[in-house]
Amino acid sequence: MDKKKGILLVALGTPRSCETEDVREYLKEFLGDPLVIQKPRWLWLPILNGIILKVRPQKSAEMYKQIWTDEGSPLMSYTIAQTEQLQGLREDFDVRFAMTYGEPRIDKVIREMKESGVEDITVLPLYPQYSLTTVEPIIQQVKKIDDKINVIRDFHQIESYTDLLAESIREKWQANHYDKLILSYHGIPLSYVTKKKDAYEAQCIETTRLVVEKLGLKEEEYEHTYQSKFGPEKWLEPATIDRIAELPKEDTKKVLICSPAFVADCLETLFELEIENKEVFVENGGETFDFVHPFNDSLEFTKVLSEVIEKNKVEVEV
């Protein structure tokens, strides 16, 4: 079948391997993006190329080694699986994937799609919530190649997404007697919201509202937090790791944690949440720390992606 329409799924990216040099190369590209670190280049680049890229890669490499599998990066493996499953569901499209940082590169994959005869491409960033730090870099990269390509900005309000998210939590929540559900989102600097008008915080809050409403949770049964703080700047609060340390002292000994901003396991879920935060919780007197994994290779999530594409198709045609 000659497919003239294409879907390009885009995830953040991952180092080629968990070796220090590959991690350094990845971090240099990621942290060097002016949309990710919004500081004057003359100030930030010497810091990045100085102490950060000398110290952080080795530390990050050790973290990656704890989550690396025989297939390599979990994020890469699950993104490939999501792509293959979506292709199986949408034979009317040529479905491929790319990474914002690292390989396969967005520009390369789009060129390959065009060369194979795909004329109408829709780019779907694998982030339910829009942010200047995640979706916007994809939009900017795509614009440089072809400003007519449509990029879907977010899908946090798609009901099938919040239904699936609630369902993934409900099974564990009902089977165990947890004191609290923690909905932990990747954080961003506060100034990106207050000064740059990033919609991310509002979309995260809306996601939490929709999910806890579906779960029927009372206000005291859940918390909304932000993880992965980097650098001295003030970030969105409360910080997940701070609350995780405080909760046992508030007689909250059994928690279930979920990270709705991630649709596939990666360093932030497998190491930061499931290992690092769990250790902090237990060290401070916590007893049960369970984790709801992202959707990963769930066929039900692939169906959500298909619905997102279909809704976008209708909106574009209208």
From Swiss-Prot:
An example Gene Ontology biological process: heme biosynthetic process
Q: Which residues form the signal peptide?
A: none
The subcellular location is: Cytoplasm
Keyword Lyase, does the record have it?
yes
The EC code for this enzyme is 4.99.1.9
- Keyword Ubl conjugation assigned to the entry: answer is no
Q: Name one GO cellular component term.
A: cytoplasm
**Pathway, per Swiss-Prot/TrEMBL?**
Porphyrin-containing compound metabolism; protoheme biosynthesis
- GO molecular-function annotation terms? ferrochelatase activity; metal ion binding
Checking InterPro entries in the record gives: Ferrochelatase, Ferrochelatase_C, Ferrochelatase_N
One family from Pfam that matches here is Ferrochelatase
Q: Where does Fe(2+) bind?
A: H186, E268
Which reaction(s) are listed as its catalytic activity?
Fe-coproporphyrin III + 2 H(+) = coproporphyrin III + Fe(2+)
What keywords are annotated for this sequence in UniProt? Cytoplasm, Heme biosynthesis, Iron, Lyase, Metal-binding, Porphyrin biosynthesis
- State the protein's purpose: Involved in coproporphyrin-dependent heme b biosynthesis. Catalyzes the insertion of ferrous iron into coproporphyrin III to form Fe-coproporphyrin III.
Protein family per UniProt = Belongs to the ferrochelatase family.
NCBIfam families assigned = hemH (TIGR00109)
Q: Which HAMAP family match?
A: Ferrochelatase
Q: What is this protein called?
A: Coproporphyrin III ferrochelatase
Q: Which organism is it from?
A: Lactococcus lactis subsp. cremoris (strain SK11)
